[in-house]
Amino acid sequence: MPLAILLSLLRHCGVRAALPTPRHLHTSPWRADCSRASLTRLRRQAYARLYPVLLVKQDGSTIHIRYREPRRMLAMPLDLDALSPEERRARFRKREAQLQQKREEEPEVVDSFDTERYKQFWTKTKK
């Protein structure tokens, strides 16, 4: 009788050692896979500082993304190499006109700062 118990224990341990141990790391059906993770809401605190933003692509299509700054809309930059030469020149002229307006609007700073009055503070004194 003890021999039968000993053999059954050896057989049981041998079968257990031969089979891989079940690990429930990313194998359970209720865990999120790549399809489910992209369709569900974010449940992590690590994404708490990301804000929903509407991303506008170059072709005009829009996508809702999460961005680190709270903005309503974020436009992708336009590829100037893809434009025709006429469109490129028109954009350049429009941009130059805006820059000239900004230069003209710069107010002249009236300064009444007297350097001689404060010269004593930046000259080194001998000790």
Swiss-Prot record:
Residues 1-32 form a transit peptide. The keyword Phosphoprotein applies. Belongs to the mitochondrion-specific ribosomal protein mL55 family. Its main location: mitochondrion. The modification Phosphoserine is found at S84. This is Large ribosomal subunit protein mL55. One of its GO terms (cellular component) is mitochondrion. One of its GO terms (molecular function) is structural constituent of ribosome. Component of the mitochondrial ribosome large subunit (39S) which comprises a 16S rRNA and about 50 distinct proteins. It is found in: Mitochondrion. One of its GO terms (biological process) is mitochondrial translation. Keywords: Mitochondrion, Phosphoprotein, Ribonucleoprotein, Ribosomal protein, Transit peptide. It comes from the Eukaryota.
